[in-house]
Every structure is written in C-alpha cells, then in structure tokens.
Design a protein with these regions (language model features):
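Internal alpha/beta core interface subdomains
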Residues: 166, 170, 179, 230-233, ...
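Flexible, glycine/charged-enriched surface loops at secondary-structure junctions
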Residues: 186-188, 301-306, 331, 375, ...
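Glycine-rich tight-turn/loop motif centered on a GG-T
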Residues: 203, 209-211, 254-283, 344-359, ...
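Mobile "lid/hinge" segments at catalytic clefts and subdomain interfaces of large enzymes
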Residues: 230-265, 419-436, 461
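Glycine-rich phosphate/ribose-binding loops and adjacent secondary-structure elements
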Residues: 274-438
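Active-site or pore-adjacent capping/gating segments
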Residues: 415-478
C-alpha cells in the first residue's frame, strides 16, 4: 500500500515538473515571438499602425477578419445589411424549409425612402372561387420550330458551373424539376450535373462561348446543334452584359478551374477563366440581330438576349431595325438585368456604380418595346435582387413576364452571405470546389428546399395579386404599384 502511494506521488511530482518545464518554455517562446514582432514592427515602414503600435497593431487584421463572420450576428439590425438584409434572408430560409413565414406585431420595413415601392391593394379582392390558376406564357411562338411554354413566373437565374460547385448544381437541377421551373446554365456551358435533375434548361451563350465554341473561339454551328439536341435545353440566351459588371467579361479564378470544369468549358486547368468584355462578332445592333436569327435557325428553339441597361439610345435603333428587317430577327425574350445584380467575382467600381437598377431599366425596356409595337413579340424577363414575393410582384407590375433569381436560390441552398464566393472558401459548399467544404451540402435535401422556396414564393405572389384585386399574378400592372418619390 505504501509502495503504491509512493509510486503515485513520484509520478505526480514528475508530471508537475514536466508541466512546469513545458509552460516555462512556452512562455519563453511567446516572449521571444513578441520581441520578434516588436522589432519587426518598429523597423518596417509599410504599415503605419504596426509601426506606431507594435504588436498590438497586429490585432487589427484579426478583428477585420473576424468581423466578416460575426458582424451580421452581433451588430447588424434586421434591415441594415447589404446586399441582402437579415429580414430578406430569413424569409427565404423559412420558405425553403417550408415553415411558417408570417411575422408579428408590425413591419420593420421603412416606406418613406425615395425609390422604394408600395403595392396598391384593391377594394374588392377576388373570392376563392374567382381565383384563376397561373396562366401559361409561350416563347418563340410562330418563329421557333420548338416554342417553349411554361406557367412559372419565377425561375433560376444564370449561375455557371465553376462559379457553383457540383452538389449545388445538382441540387438546383433536381429542385427546379420538382418545382416545374427552368434553370439557366450561366455562361460556363451545360454539364451532366445540369441534365441529371431533368429540369428545363436555358443555355446561356457568354462572350467566351463556352460549350459552343470552335478551336478558334468562334461560335460553332455543330456544337450549337449538339447542345440543342438535349430535349431539356428549351431556350438559348445570348449574354451581352451582367448586372454586377457591365462591360467586363466573366471572371472565374484559376483556383476554381478544376479538371471537370476545364473539360466542360474547354480551357486549361488551374488558369483564370477570363471572358472577353463583349462578343467579338457583335459590334452593332445588326450583328446582334444576325446572331439571334442564326442561333434560332440552327437550334430551332427560342433565343433571347440578356443585357444591363445604361445608355438607352441604342434601344430605339434596336427596335427600329427589327421592324425594318422583320420580326424573325427579334429576340424571343429580353432579360433585363439590374445594375445591382450578383457575381462570383467583379471589380468593386462596376458592382457599385455601373448600370441602372431594375426599377429604372425594366420600365424603360418595356416602354421602348411598346412604342415600337414589339411588346407582344418579345417576352420580358428581369433579374436582380428580387428574392422575396413583394419584389417579384413589383417586377410583374412594371411589365415583366417572368422574374429570375440567382442569389435567392443560393440562400435556399444554405448560403449565409459570407462573401467568400471568389476565394474558393465558401463555408456552405455552394461556391467552392473544396471537397471537404462540399460535404455539408446534400443535393437531395437541398433540392427539396429549392423547390419549396420557388413554390412558396409563387404562392405568396399570388396572394399579393389577389390583394391587388386581380385573379392571378400575370394580370398585375403598373396601376398596382407606387414608387416613392
């Protein structure tokens, strides 16, 4: 018994001695590190804060980094954050999870800021038996050999494979099929992951023409036919510009160009994928009309265009030349992208200041088409920060036939607005190709959330339409909307 006690005492003494030595060494190393940082800070001249406040000044970088993650949870109010505030995101999260999205007590939304909108209710909303189902809309009727019809007015906007991860694309494809909406492929070409869900696809032709380019980078008729041979590819969209970066081509950082993405796009692995700032074969309105007509003739499917509106004088020439050359040269649809649209990577000056917001550009395009007698020929789609029912309803009031959203569906997938899209470090696995980070994104579960979000949003837009006094959303018009001035 005494032997065991002595042995335990001996081991305890040895343990404490070793612990004391380790702690002493750690303190010495820490002091040496602090001394090294102090000398380095006071002798360097690049960083003023570190020179004036050696060692302590280094905490600035730590706090800046942590602020990206904690600011939205600890300091921001419900309606403060940009580009999307907590109230906007929370509605999407609840809709995607198919849980109660009602709120209590009163609104936190200010209604007196110039540029904001107010939806105008009608005195006699339709009764339940007077409500109509969503009407269908057809693209390319009378001009495309295979026109496309849908009754969905809310769809998934362009997000390319490369900007998004494999599980994100798979979830969007499956969810779009469940909800009966389309998925725009973005400019990164169509992949097997887009096709596997069985949803309708809109193939976007970007300035680099990924997926439909020949060895010289020009548009290939044979590859167009190959893409059009997929029954799921319902329409084609020629991208002129993007809301977050008008006049700048697409940017996919080399860190996100994996082997499968490089193979899909036809580019080198690991190198930055930089698209031209415009189509090399489109330098005027007539070139654009020729391209629209060519793609429709080859594919037999509806063909439209996507553009951010800034200088608007070209729209008159665009409409005039269509009437002069014939309606077969008109786009089957015109996607108006807001100047505050989203992106995976873009210069901040373009994100912040370039291009008109949708509340200015959408009515402008609709008015121009009406003035030139083209509104019935050209369907109008819009995109840009419309992730909640009220925003979608407002766009329908302003004249849109359909509304597309990209970031709304990213929130449905689980996006937490960490602003890491361009770093390949997205914590939710949506915009990263790090397989460890992708493990948290289950395509099967997230597909249900994508479908729930689309269904719940369209249902609530129907509720708004009924409050405005019309039987279904496509009957909304400008008399149902007030812009605060």
């Amino acid at each position: 018994m005494d032997f065991n006690l002595n042995t335990l005492q001996h081991f305890a003494l040895v343990f404490f001695e070793i612990t004391a030595i380790v702690i002493t060494l750690a303190i010495c190393l820490l002091l040496l590190a602090v001394l090294y940082m102090y000398i380095a800070d006071v002798t360097q001249s690049r960083h003023t804060i570190r020179r004036n406040y050696p060692v302590l000044g280094r905490f600035r970088y730590l706090f800046e980094h942590l602020g990206e993650f904690f600011r939205q949870y600890l300091f921001a109010q419900d309606r403060e954050e940009m580009p999307f505030n907590r109230a906007q995101r929370a509605w999407v999260y609840r809709a995607a999870k198919n849980i109660d999205s009602t709120v209590a007590f009163g609104s936190t939304q200010p209604i007196n800021r110039p540029g904001d909108f107010i939806l105008l209710n009608g005195p006699f909303p339709p009764l339940e038996e007077e409500i109509k189902p969503r009407s269908a809309i057809t693209f390319g009727a009378g001009y495309a050999r295979q026109p496309y019809s849908t009754n969905a007015f809310f769809n998934i906007s362009a997000m390319s494979f490369g900007a998004l991860s494999v599980p994100a694309i798979r979830a969007l494809s499956r969810g779009a099929h469940q909800a009966g909406i389309w998925l725009n492929t973005g400019e990164g070409a169509v992949s097997t992951y887009h096709l596997e869900g069985g949803c309708d696809l809109v193939f976007q032709i970007g300035t680099a023409k990924y997926g439909v380019r020949d060895e010289h980078g020009a548009l290939s008729d044979d590859k167009l036919r190959a893409v059009a041979s997929h029954e799921q590819v319902r329409m084609f969209e020629i991208k002129l510009s993007q809301g977050a970066k008008p006049g700048k081509g697409g940017i996919l950082p080399g860190i996100k160009v994996t082997e499968v993405i490089a193979s899909t796009r036809g580019i080198p692995v690991g190198q930055d994928s930089l698209s031209p700032n415009r189509h090399t074969d489109i330098s005027c309105v007539d070139d654009l009309l020729d391209m629209l007509h060519r793609v429709r003739t080859i594919t037999g499917k509806p063909v439209g265009m996507k553009a951010v509106i800034g200088q608007a004088a070209w729209l008159d020439e665009f409409c005039r030349r269509i009437n002069e050359r014939g309606l077969q040269y008109a786009p089957d649809f015109f996607t108006v992208d807001s100047g505050d649209g989203g992106t995976g990577a873009a210069p901040q000056s373009l994100i912040d200041y370039m291009g008109l917001p949708i509340q200015n550009s959408l009515p402008l395009v609709v008015n121009k088409l009406q003035e030139h007698g083209l509104r019935e020929r050209v369907r109008v789609i819009c995109s840009g920060k419309m992730i909640n029912p009220a925003g979608v309803a407002a766009a329908l009031c302003m004249g849109a036939d359909c509304v597309n959203s990209a970031r709304g569906f990213m929130f449905a997938l689980g996006c937490v607005q960490s602003l890491q899209c361009n770093r390949n470090t997205c914590p939710t696995g949506i915009t990263t190709h790090d397989e460890e980070l992708q493990q948290g994104l289950d395509p099967t579960d997230k597909a249900h959330r994508v479908a729930n979000y689309a269904a719940n949003l369209m249902h609530e837009v129907e509720v708004i339409a009924h409050s405005c006094g019309v039987a279904e959303p496509r009957l909304l018009s400008r008399e149902h909307l007030l812009i605060v001035s």
